[in-house]
């Protein structure tokens, strides 16, 4: 075995560590906001409003309630773990691009109002996993693409107005 090779167990550990780190942060924000009634949701992404620019960075951490948070958690856990497991060398870069681009696009073209939740990242993860699996001509990654379409294909309907 090559000194630079990585075992499946190490890949899984890496994937779960990065996934858990983000989930702990969004759950932590939700619990603190709920416990102390801070009203943090006003800091969401408000498209085309100067005061909404900070929301590009904050909106994925804010959720309207436990059901909203749970729905984002379940999808995020699966898709993010797949990204970090199968695309280890690209994962951090892809994730950061999705984080910033989803927030910026929402600010530029989103509907009026205050947008909160990690759905933009979830849509980005699903899109990347699907497209990457199709264009890489790799049977395993193509299978992952099909799983993503099967499990999350309905996400596209939530993006349309």
Predicted regions mapped to residue ranges:
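A detector for small-residue-rich transmembrane helices and their helix-helix packing motifs
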Residues: 2-161
């Amino acid at each position: 075995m090559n000194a630079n090779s990585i075992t499946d167990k190490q890949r899984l550990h890496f994937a779960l560590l990065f996934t858990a780190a983000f989930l702990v942060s969004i759950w932590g924000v939700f619990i603190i906001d709920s416990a102390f009634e801070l009203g943090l949701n006003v800091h969401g992404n408000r498209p085309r409003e100067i005061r909404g620019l900070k929301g590009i960075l904050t909106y994925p951490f804010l959720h309207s309630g436990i059901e909203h948070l749970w729905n984002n958690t379940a999808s995020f856990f699966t898709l993010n773990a797949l990204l970090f497991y199968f695309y280890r060398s690209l994962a951090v870069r892809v994730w950061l691009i999705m984080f910033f681009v989803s927030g910026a696009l929402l600010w530029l073209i989103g509907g009026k109002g205050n947008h909160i939740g990690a759905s933009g990242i979830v849509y980005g993860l699903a899109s990347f996993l699907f497209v990457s699996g199709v264009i890489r001509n790799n049977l395993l990654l193509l299978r992952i693409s099909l799983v993503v379409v099967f499990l999350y294909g309905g996400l596209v309907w939530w993006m349309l107005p």
